[in-house]
C-alpha cells in the first residue's frame, strides 16, 4: 500500500515535471520569438534534454506550485534577461522594446568601434611615416612656390621700372601700398624743393637727375604716412643708367674731375665767343677769381637747398605750381628769346673773394636785397641781391667764408646789359670812356679809401722818389701836372679794367707842399 502510494506519487511528480518542462520550453520559444520580433538581444534558455531525477523521499508540499515559480520575476529576469515591473512582475513591452533597440544598436556600435579602434591603432603606426613624408614634401613645395612668387614679383617690378622710362613726359605713375620705396628707378636724384600744392593734402617734392646736362626731373607726392602716392616724370634721360648708386671715393673723384674738365672746356668755348670780355677783364692781387660749373644748378643756392626752404622774390609772380617760376630767368628771356624757347649756353658764375669788415661791396652797380638764408656747410648767412636796372638779369649772393670771418665771398651770375650807373652827386658819367653795352663783363671794383687796398697799392712819398720823377707820370700810376702847382691832382687807377676807375680825389696837401720845392 505504501509502495503503491509512493509509485503513484512519483509518477505524478514526473508528469508535473515533464509538464513544467514542456511549458517552460513553450514559454521559452514564445518569449524567444517575441523577443526576436522586438529586436531584443538574443538569449535562449534551453531546458536539459534529459533530467535524471531521483525519487524524492519526501512528498512535495502542496503549497509549492511550478506555475508560481515560473511566473516569478526572478525566473523571468534570469531566463530572458528582461527587466520587469518591480510591483507586478509583468513585462513592460514598450519600454523593453525601445531599450532593447537602443541597447542592440549600442552593442553593435561598440563592437564595431572596438574593431575599428584595434584596426586603426595597428594601421596608424604603419602609416605615420608616410604622413610625415607628405607633410615635408608639401612644406618644400610651399617654400618653392613662395620663392617663385617673390622672383616673379621682382621681375614684374623691374619690368615696371623699365616701362616707366619709356613713358611720355608729364605722365603720372601711381603706386600701391606695397611699393613704397623712394623712387628707386636706377638713377641718381637730388632734391631741390618741396611745397604744399593746392587741392592735395600730400606734400610734393621735386627732384632732378644729378647727371650733368640731364634735363630729367620728377615730382613725388607722399602721403602723411610717408607712402609714395604719385610720381610724375618730366623729360627723358640722355645717358644710360649708372651701374651703382653708391660710388666709391675713387670713382667719385674721377666723376667730379670729369665734370670739372667738362666745365673748363665749356668756359673756354664761352670765352672764345666773347673776346671783348676777355680783353677787358683782368685779375687783381686783391681778388681771387674762379669760375664755377653751372651745368647742374638752376637757381640761387640750388646746391644747398634744404627741405622746406625757398627763396621767393617779392616782385616775381607765381605763374603756377611749378618751382621753375621762382627761379632766375634764363638767358633766352633776357636776350629777346632768340634761342627758340630752350636754354642754350648758360653764363658761368664768377666768384670774387676779398677781405673786408663790411658785407656791402661797392662795385658801381645798384643792387636790391631780396632774400637771405643759411646754407649747408656755412654758419654765416647768405644774402641775395639783384640788379635794380629794369631788364637786367644779373644777380649775386654775398656771404662770409666759414674759415675766415673777414673773407667776403661774392658770387655773380649773368652779365649786365647796361652801363654802370652814375654815382650819386658826382660827374663820373662825363669822365668815363664809352663802353659797348653788348659785351660788358662783371667788373667788381674796390671800395674807395678801403684800408686793404690803400695799404697794398699805395706807399708813402719820399723826397728821393719825387726828385727821380722827371716825367709827367708820377710813381704808382698817378698823373701829375708839374707846370701848375695850384692845379688839382687827378688820380685815376684802373683796378680790374678800363671800365672801372677810382673817383676823383681831392688835392693832397702833402704832395702840393713837396711840389713847391720842385725846380
From Swiss-Prot:
Modification after translation, per record: Phosphorylated by MPK4. Phosphorylated on serine residues by MPK3 and MPK6 following infection with the necrotrophic fungal pathogen B.cinerea.
Keyword Nucleus (UniProt): yes
Family: Belongs to the WRKY group I family.
Residue ranges, compositional bias (Low complexity): 130-142, 245-254
SMART domains the UniProt entry points to: WRKY
Resulting phenotype, residue 366 to Q: No effect on the interaction with VQ10 protein
Subcellular location field: Nucleus
GO BP terms, alphabetized: camalexin biosynthetic process; cellular heat acclimation; cellular response to heat; defense response to bacterium; defense response to fungus; positive regulation of autophagy; response to cold; response to heat
Inactivation phenotype: No visible phenotype under normal growth conditions, but mutant plants are extremely susceptible to the necrotrophic fungal pathogen B.cinerea.
Major localization class: nucleus
Region (Disordered): 1-34, 123-212, 232-255, 267-349
PANTHER family from the UniProt entry: WRKY TRANSCRIPTION FACTOR 33-RELATED (PTHR31221:SF1), WRKY TRANSCRIPTION FACTOR PROTEIN 1-RELATED (PTHR31221)
Comp. bias (Basic and acidic residues): 178-188, 323-332
Protein name: Probable WRKY transcription factor 33
GO CC terms: nucleus
Gene: WRKY33
Polar residues: bias regions: 7-34, 164-174, 269-299
GO molecular function annotation: DNA-binding transcription factor activity; metal ion binding; transcription cis-regulatory region binding
Binding site for Zn(2+): 209, 214, 237, 239, 387, 392, 416, 418
Subunit (UniProt): Interacts with MKS1. Interacts with ATG18A. Interacts with SIB1 and SIB2. Interacts with VQ1 and VQ10.
Amino acid at each position: 500500500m505504501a509502495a503503491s502510494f509512493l509509485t503513484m506519487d512519483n509518477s505524478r511528480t514526473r508528469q508535473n515535471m515533464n509538464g513544467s518542462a514542456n511549458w517552460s520550453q513553450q514559454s521559452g520559444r514564445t518569449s524567444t520569438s517575441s523577443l526576436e520580433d522586438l529586436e531584443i538581444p538574443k538569449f535562449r534558455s534551453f531546458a536539459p534534454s534529459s533530467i535524471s531525477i531521483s525519487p524524492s523521499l519526501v512528498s512535495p508540499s502542496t503549497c509549492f506550485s511550478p506555475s508560481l515559480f515560473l511566473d516569478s520575476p526572478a525566473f523571468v529576469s534570469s531566463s530572458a534577461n528582461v527587466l520587469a515591473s518591480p510591483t507586478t512582475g509583468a513585462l513592460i513591452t514598450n519600454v523593453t522594446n525601445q531599450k532593447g533597440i537602443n541597447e542592440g544598436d549600442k552593442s553593435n556600435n561598440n563592437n564595431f568601434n572596438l574593431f575599428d579602434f584595434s584596426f586603426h591603432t595597428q594601421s596608424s603606426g604603419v602609416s605615420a611615416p608616410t604622413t610625415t613624408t607628405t607633410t615635408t614634401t608639401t612644406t618644400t613645395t610651399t617654400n618653392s612656390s613662395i620663392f617663385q612668387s617673390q622672383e616673379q614679383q621682382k621681375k614684374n617690378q623691374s619690368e615696371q621700372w623699365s616701362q616707366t622710362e619709356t613713358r611720355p613726359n608729364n605722365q603720372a605713375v601711381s603706386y600701391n601700398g606695397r611699393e613704397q620705396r623712394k623712387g628707386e628707378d636706377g638713377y641718381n636724384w637730388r632734391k631741390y624743393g618741396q611745397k604744399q600744392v593746392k587741392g592735395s593734402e600730400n606734400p610734393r617734392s621735386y627732384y632732378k637727375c644729378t647727371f650733368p646736362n640731364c634735363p630729367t626731373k620728377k615730382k613725388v607726392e607722399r602721403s602723411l604716412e610717408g607712402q609714395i602716392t604719385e610720381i610724375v616724370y618730366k623729360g627723358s634721360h640722355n645717358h644710360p643708367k649708372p651701374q651703382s648708386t653708391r660710388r666709391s671715393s675713387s670713382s667719385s673723384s674721377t666723376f667730379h674731375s670729369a665734370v670739372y674738365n667738362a666745365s673748363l672746356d665749356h668756359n673756354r668755348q664761352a670765352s672764345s665767343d666773347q673776346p671783348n670780355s676777355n680783353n677787358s677783364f683782368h685779375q687783381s692781387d686783391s681778388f681771387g677769381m674762379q669760375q664755377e660749373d653751372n651745368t647742374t644748378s638752376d637757381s640761387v643756392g640750388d646746391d644747398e637747398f634744404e627741405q622746406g626752404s625757398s627763396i621767393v622774390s617779392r616782385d616775381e609772380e607765381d605763374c603756377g605750381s611749378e618751382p621753375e617760376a621762382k627761379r632766375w630767368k634764363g638767358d633766352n628771356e633776357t636776350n629777346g628769346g632768340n634761342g627758340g624757347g630752350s636754354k642754350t649756353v648758360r653764363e658761368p658764375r664768377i666768384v670774387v673773394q676779398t677781405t673786408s669788415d663790411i658785407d656791402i661791396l661797392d662795385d658801381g652797380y645798384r643792387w636790391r636785397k631780396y632774400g637771405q638764408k643759411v646754407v649747408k656747410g656755412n654758419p654765416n648767412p647768405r644774402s641775395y641781391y639783384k640788379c635794380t636796372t629794369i631788364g637786367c638779369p644779373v644777380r649775386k649772393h654775398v656771404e662770409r667764408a666759414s674759415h675766415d670771418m673777414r673773407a667776403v665771398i661774392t658770387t655773380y651770375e649773368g652779365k649786365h646789359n647796361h652801363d654802370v650807373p652814375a654815382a650819386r652827386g658826382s660827374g663820373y658819367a662825363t669822365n668815363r670812356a664809352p663802353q659797348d653795352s653788348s659785351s660788358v663783363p662783371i667788373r667788381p671794383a674796390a671800395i674807395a679809401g678801403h684800408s686793404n687796398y690803400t695799404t697794398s697799392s699805395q706807399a708813402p712819398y719820399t723826397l728821393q722818389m719825387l726828385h727821380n720823377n722827371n716825367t709827367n707820370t708820377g710813381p704808382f700810376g698817378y698823373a701829375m701836372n708839374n707846370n701848375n702847382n695850384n692845379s688839382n691832382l687827378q688820380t685815376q687807377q684802373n683796378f680790374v679794367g678800363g671800365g672801372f676807375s677810382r673817383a676823383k680825389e681831392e688835392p693832397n696837401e702833402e704832395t702840393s707842399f713837396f711840389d713847391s720845392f720842385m725846380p
